[in-house]
A protein has these predicted regions:
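Non-catalytic cap/lid and distal C-terminal segments of serine-dependent acyl enzymes
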Residues: 1-187
């Protein structure tokens, strides 16, 4: 939500108008990322922690998702680093929109990450992408995120980025490789 809100009002209005014309469903309705995270952190997690024997500290609390779920998982880690100790971001939808021109979303999100990622050594981050279909669009953006991770001082103890040749943007592909982020985060 905050990367979108960091755009100029004119750019936000342009994306919303574009979406309302049916050309981009991503911004066709209000953005409720912060409300969703508030629900997870303030309602769901306390409910689960109260009713089940859980380890409640950040080093035992992870979040993950695929595609836009990868973006919101990373957003959750940056907004609530005191809650989440790691994030698994599979086939992260770095492109945001499908606009071929003037797509400012990737740059805005990268800037947001540079400002908000927790210090290296305190959290674990996992990213991946495939090479088929929609996933084939992600590599240049993931490489920029990888550069940022290096620049910020993350290393192989707290960051892993993987490319899966032949993997597509699908539940089947994510299921086939889910053990990789789980082993990394839980190790």
């Amino acid at each position: 939500q905050k990367p979108f809100e960091n755009q100029t009002k004119a750019r936000q209005d342009s994306l919303i108008a574009h979406a309302k014309r049916g050309q981009n469903s991503l911004f066709s309705s209000p953005i409720y990322s912060d409300r969703y995270l508030s629900f997870l952190v303030d309602e769901l997690k306390p409910f689960v922690d109260e009713r089940y024997a859980t380890a409640t500290t950040p080093e035992h609390t992870f979040i993950g998702g695929s595609s836009m779920g990868g973006l919101i998982s990373l957003y959750a880690l940056t907004e609530y680093p005191e809650v989440f100790g790691g994030a698994a971001c599979l086939s992260t939808h770095w492109i945001g929109t499908f606009e071929s021109t003037a797509n400012t979303f990737p740059g805005l999100y990268l800037r947001y990450l540079e400002e908000r990622l927790p210090k290296p050594g305190t959290h674990k981050l996992y990213y991946d992408y495939g090479t088929v279909g929609l996933d084939s669009l992600y590599e240049p953006y993931q490489l920029k995120v990888d550069e940022l991770m290096n620049k910020l001082g993350y290393d192989d103890r707290n960051w892993l980025s993987r490319k899966f040749e032949g993997a597509e943007h699908s539940e089947r592909s994510w299921k086939a490789r889910l053990s990789t982020p789980l082993k990394f985060l839980l190790n």
